Every structure is written in C-alpha cells, then in structure tokens.
Amino acid sequence: MLIFYAKYAFIFWFFVGSNQGEMLLMDKISHDKTLLNVTACTQNCLEKGQMDFRSCLKDCRINGTFPGALRKVQENYQMNMICRTESEIVFQIDWVQHSRGTEPAPNATYIIRVDAVKDDNKETALYLSDDNFLILPGLESNSTHNITALAMHGDGSYSLIAKDQTFATLIRGYQPSKMGAVNLLRFVPQPDDLHHIAAEIEWKPSAESNCYFDMVSYSTNSVNMDEPLEVQFRDRKKLYRHTVDNLEFDKQYHVGVRTVNIMNRLESDLQWLPIAVPSCLDWYPYNYTLCPPHKPENLTVTQKQYLPNILALNITWARPRYLPDNYTLHIFDLFKGGTELNYTLDQNRSHFYVPKITVLGSHFEVHLVAQSAGGKNVSGLTLDKVHRGVLLSEGNMVKLVLFIIVPICCILMLCSLTFCRRNRSEVQALQMDAKDAKASEFHLSLMDSSGLLVTLSANESLEVMDELEVEPHSVLLQDVLGEGAFGLVRRGVYKKRQVAVKLLKDEPNDEDVYAFKCEIQMLKAVGKHPNIVGIVGYSTRFSNQMMLLIEYCSLGSLQNFLREEWKFRQEQNAIGLKKNLEQNVDNRRFNRLPRNSIHDRIEDINNSMLSTVEEESESDQTHSSRCETYTLTRITNAADNKGYGLEDIENIGGSYIPKTAEAPKDRPKRKLKPQPKKDSKQDFKSDNKKRIFENKEYFDCLDSSDTKPRIPLKYADLLDIAQQVAVGMEFLAQNKVVHRDLAARNVLISVDRSIKIADFGLSRDVYHENVYRKSGGSGKLPIKWLALESLTHQVYTSQSDVWSFGVLLYEITTLGGMPYPSVSPSDLLQLLRQGHRMKRPEGCTQEMFSLMESCWSSVPSHRPTFSALKHRLGGMILATNDVPERLKQLQAATESKLKSCDGLNSKVEQVPCEEELYLEPLN
C-alpha cells in the first residue's frame, strides 16, 4: 500500500497545473479509496481557506487527515459538453436546483476519468479539478472517449455525476459547418455613454460544436461603406453570448457570426442578424435633455404680395405634445445676394407672422428648427414667390368662382358627354370590323391593315399627334422575332425601311401601358446617335393597338454574336486538327514505312482522336464552364435579340403559332449580302399579291451558292466593339441618362459590325436567363453586372454604369462568357464587400485586365469616365497595328459608292445613286 501510495503521489506531483481551475492529471491510477481520501482531504483544506489547491493537495498527499468513512450520496449534478476541437473537449458541471429549492451549490472537488477507446487496448487518464469548467487537452483527433465524473466533498461524501458518457474529438482539418441561429436578447444601456446603447447577442452552437467563432457587424446606414468590425472569440468560457456596444440610435445594423477552424483558417458561412436600434426618444421617453426633439410637423406658409418683391408671410405648424426648448425660424432668399432673416421663437408658439420681407428671386426657403439641450431637428420648405396679379380678395374670389369658373365647368361637361357618345359609336364600328378581320386567314409575309384592328375600350381617347406618331395600318408586319411576358416583337417595314416593331399583348393592364409609354419617352429623350438604338415611330392612341418602331439590327445581340464566334473558333480548331491528322497519314503512306504493330497502333489512335474531335465539334452546343447554357443549332429568320423578346410566338390577334412553324433547323444560315438593283418595271410584272424588296440584308436568302467565308474576329475587332460601346455610353452620360443594365445581351450589332446600345432604363420582363434576381418590389436586378453601391444602397449613376462596362469587357474578352461563373448571385455581394474581383481570363492581355479592374473600384469616383475609356481603347487599337474589319468594310463601301456614282468615263449604263428607291436599314 505504501508503494502504491508513493506512485500515486509522484504522479500527482508531476502533472500539477497552475491555471485557475487547477486541473491535475493522474495517469495509470486505479479508482480506489486512496484517491477518494486524498481528494476529500484536499476539498476540506480548501474549505478552510488557508492554502490554495496545489498546496492543499501536496499537504494531503504527505500529512493528510482523511475522513473517518467514505459514503456515496445522491446529488443533482449535470455534465454538459460546451465545445470541442481536434485535440480538446470542453465541458461544464452544473448544480441543478430543485424547482422550489433555494440552497446554494455545495463545494466540491471533481474527479474525472477519461477512457480512450482504441482497437487493441484501453488507455485511462484521471483528472482532478476544483473548477466546474473543464478542458481536456492533448487528445487525439477523431478519437472517442468515455468520461466518468465524481463530485467529492470535504466530509467524505461523494456523488456520481456521469458514468461512461461518450464524447469524440473532431477530425484533423475539419471544415466548420453552418452556424446555429443568432438572436437578439435585449438592448442594454451604456453607463459611460448615454448617447449610444448596446445589444446583447446570443447564438447557438454549430453542428460540430466547434470552440472558435468570429463576429462581424456594420451599419447599413453608413454612407462611406466602412469596413465591418470583427470580434474573435478564442476564450472557451465566453462563448455563445456577446454584447455589441456603441450602437447609434435609430440606425440599422447587421451582425454576422461564423465558426472557424483556427488551425487551417477554414470558416463557415456567416449567419446574419438584422438589428433595428430604437430611436433616442423611444429609449429615453421624451427626454429632451439627452435627445433632440421631433421635427416640426405640418409646416405651411401662406404668402401675400402687396408691392413688387415685398411679401407678407404667415407661417404655421402643428403644436407637438412635448414642447422643445425653443424654435428658430430661418428665411432664405435664393437670389444671389438675397437677404436672410432669423427669428428665435418661444416653445409655445405654433405660428408666426412676417409682415414684410424682401424677396428678389423667384424662389425662397423657410426652415423651422426645434431645439433642446439634446439636439435639434429641422423641417424645411422651398416655395415659389407668388405674383401680385394672381392675389385676390376673398370677395373677388367668390365672384370669380360663381360667374366664370362654374359656367366653364358646365360647358366642358357637356362637350365631354357629346364627345364620349361619338367616340362610343366609332368604337362599336371598329369592333365590328375587327371581328371580320379575325375571321380571315393570317399571312406572315404580308398583313392587311384590317388585321390590326382590335377591341377598343370605350373610355379611350386619342392622344396628341407628333412627328413620330404613326398610323398602325402604315406598318407592314412580318415574322415574329421574339416574345416575352410584356409583349412581342415583329419584324416590319415602315416607309421602305426595315424596322423592329414592339407590340403589347392582348388586353394589357395599366402597368404594361404605363411602362410601354415610359419606354417611348426614354427613347425620344435620348436622341440620335450612331451607337444608340434609335426610335423610328410609335402609335399610342389606343392601348390595345400600341406599337413602338425601333431600328432593326440583323445580327442580334452582342452576347449571341460573341458566342457564335466562340463556336466558330472551336470548329476551325477541330477542322485544323483533322487536316493535320490526315496529312500525317498521307506522309506515312508516301514514305511507305513498313507497317508493324506500333504504326498500326498510332494510326488507330489518330483515327480515334479524329472521330472524337468531329463528334465534339458537331455536338458541342454549350460554351464552357464559365458560360451559360445556350442553343447554337437553332436558326431563325433573325438573330436572337434581348430587346426583341424570346420564346413562344403570338400574332397580333392573339392566336398561337407553334414552334414547328419556324424554319427547319437543318436549313443553311442566312447570309447577308446586298443585291444589285434591278429594273423597277420588271419587278412590277410579277404577281401583285407578292411584294419584292430590293434590300436582301434584312430578309431570308437561302441561296448559299455564293457565300463568303466567315472572317474570324481579331483582337482589334474586339477592341473596336468595346470602343463603340464606350462611345455610346459617353453620349448617354453626357445626356444625364443612366443605363442601369449595361451587358452584352443589351447591346445589338448590325451587319456592318456597328454597335448599338439598347434597353437603357426600359422594362425587364422579356428576360429569361438566370441573371436577374427579384428586388424589393416587382422589378428584377442583374446582380452580376451591378456596381457595389447599387447592390448595397440602390445608387445608380454613370459611375455604376462604368462598373457594368468592366463586366462587359469580360464578356467580350471571353467571347460571351458568364461573369463570376462559380459564384451564385446570393453570395456575390459578400465577396465584393471583401474585395474579391474576377481573375484575369485566359487569353486576356494585362492591359485589358487592368482596364477591367479600374472599372471595378469600390470607390465610384476612382473609376474612369467613359470618355477616358474611349481614349484608352482607341490607343489599344492603334497599338495592335491592325485595322478593325468594320473600318475596312466601311472604307471599301465608300470607295465602291464613289466608283459607282462616277459615270463620266464609263460606257456602261450605271445604276442611279438615288437611295430613296431602296429599302434602307437604320443601322
């Protein structure tokens, strides 16, 4: 027994710790009476308060006085795991009080036995602690342990807390899982700062019960986009609850908590908690010593003019329930060099009369400031100065109403009734004509004007005509280009010009009509520019017959144009590989090399690779992992255009045209080639029912016998496209127009490769790709193209369009690639706030990527202007020592036109250069 006791004592001495809990490890010691006696003696020594835990244990080990008898009792202890890591398990022993009990928790020293469960053996370790918060260190990762706990008292009584409860450590390099819920417990005051309050936050453990957490918080009302505040929790005793201080009254905050693995810097997603801080007057009920008063309500100003520039003002406001200390009234004349008057008013005032004030300008401002010891609040009005001639006395005003205004109103009512009756009869006649028109067969190539007649509402009236207002029957509607939820777009001819006609669907609601008119007003206000899609005309006299005529761009959207270029390059690479393989086979046959098993194997591999490349070239219908899925095999009469709508087709009468009515997929693609002018007399000899158009650029040309080989895009061509977009956006910025949705899908391209920007400030309902996310209302937002300030504060400026232009450069460089290919729209905002941006794509020069990065600056004022972008892109084009294909074609067309118009030295009859006889495209 003496030897066993010495070994027991030696191990106690060897593993004594010095932390607050004074945990002591005793390895390879059995659970026996010696251990219980030493523990009881130690606890008895601690209760006397003469020595600390280490000294008591040492004294009991040498000269200890043991209790007379050990006895087991039943007590209300509970052991709970707090957290764990790869090498630690943290748990706490709590005294559970009865529902009616009030006795305090008894003093005890805890004995903890840890059995490590292994395949071939069982290792046991013993711990002693006078603290109920226990940390078991030095454990193996991903190991299981059975824990038994005893509570030992100084009188020799002990109780069993837990027996063989199983706990496990985490695996090495674990990935922290999703956080638990984060809740707001309460707001608490800050005694040292009465102008701020604090919030107590509580969160639940993560799924793996990790021990380390990070917390970030920021104010959503911040205008300078400050960095979020971060707090790291590394003390295991301070988990799951924290107080966020220095919160400003009446502000919005976001608090996020995540769990982290500090060994390899892995972390989980943030779990966010929005916090709405109460106002100062709600926290300190109407304490104007600490809080500013409410702003004055119902501020009104009545003015009278007796002499030129001399006014009398009667200013009134609502009397508040809780009065401020005083008011200050400020009156400002906005004219240069105008006067400023200031008045200090008593707290009981609710009105003030200014008998005479000189106002030189046409506008002036009135500000009423409510002041107290806690601050001030202001209400203001900007007013137009009334003229003396329009001011009448009350008696004259009554006479004016009785003898002039009332008779005029009666006359207007009679005229309105007469007009409504005449309009109702005209509408009924139109309805009868429309029913007859719907019964006739609809022809896609030519539509009679009666086919446009639809049912009109009785309460609709004609709008004021202007130079762009067109008659619906003067527009020849042809095939459908696309359709969306808002309406559909057809190809049409108006005054010998090819146009795109945007129509509303049958029975549009008020919101559709309003959005359609807003789109027309925007296009009219922007004006004409070579790189902006222009308006040709519109018809808005009846809501069921509204149409918008815009320029027709035959090559469709820039996005599809770039993706077709990407596919063309892939096919050319496959063809080149095929030719190289065939040439290698011919060379081997020409040299008449002796065939053996090795050469046979090489030829088989080459043939297999050739067939694989051909299959991939034929079946590849997608871009790459960075692009959205889209169909390349569909051939339509016109290229897809986002501004023209998509999906199913509906005619103007509302009948459905199935997709099988489209051109067959295997027909050759339409080649755009100008045709020579023919004799007009010969043209009109054909069938009168069939109309022939001279300009083949906008119509199907299925004869592919005389087709030109496709010219691949060069780097100079891509730079030319980007520069044209910058020129168009520069024009919009100079006219104070913010696009808000600049992307390749909203840029159109003509047959001569000229660029036209479309869909600026227009409706978004025709979009079908997953690049738009719902905003707070019914609108949608293009998340991956929006600037950081647009995502966080809904701020849209020309600088935010520059950010979108940088994303457009990424699309051009990658030939239609999807921005942020591996990031979902819901995660993008967090990454942008952390400073993440897209990496340089493959094949992109450093100069181009630097231009992209300058557009993505988090500070809007640090981004380049569109004028600067235009000049930088122009310099990059000159640096290539190459001329874009568009400029070459433009130069060749100009020279050809000059030669054709010069008939002095030619004996051949020349075609007249009168362009008005041709169908002219607007692009």
From Swiss-Prot:
Source superkingdom: Eukaryota
Glycosylation site residues: N37, N63, N107, N142, N146, N287, N298, N314, N326, N342, N348, N377
Name of the top EC class for this enzyme: transferase
UniProt note: phenotype after gene disruption: RNAi-mediated knockdown in the prothoracic gland (PG) delays the onset of pupariation by prolonging the L3 larval stage. In addition, pupal size and, to a lesser extent, PG cell size are increased.
Annotated GO CC locations: plasma membrane; receptor complex
Keywords: ATP-binding, Developmental protein, Glycoprotein, Kinase, Magnesium, Membrane, Metal-binding, Nucleotide-binding, Phosphoprotein, Receptor, Signal, Transferase, Transmembrane, Transmembrane helix, Tyrosine-protein kinase
PTM entry text: May be auto-phosphorylated on tyrosine residues.
S-S pairs: none
Gene3D superfamilies: Phosphorylase Kinase, domain 1, Transferase(Phosphotransferase) domain 1
Predominant cellular place of this UniProt entry's protein: membrane
SMART domains xref list: TyrKc
Domain Protein kinase: 475-874
Reaction catalysis annotation: L-tyrosyl-[protein] + ATP = O-phospho-L-tyrosyl-[protein] + ADP + H(+)
Molecular function as annotated in GO: ATP binding; metal ion binding; transmembrane receptor protein tyrosine kinase activity
Cofactor(s) listed in the protein's UniProt record: Mg(2+)
Residues carrying Phosphoserine: S608
Annotated segments matching region Disordered: 656-687
Active site: D741
Family annotation (PANTHER family): TYROSINE-PROTEIN KINASE RECEPTOR, TYROSINE-PROTEIN KINASE RECEPTOR TORSO
This protein's name: Tyrosine-protein kinase receptor torso
Source organism (scientific name): Drosophila melanogaster
Lineage: Eukaryota, Metazoa, Ecdysozoa, Arthropoda, Hexapoda
Gene: tor
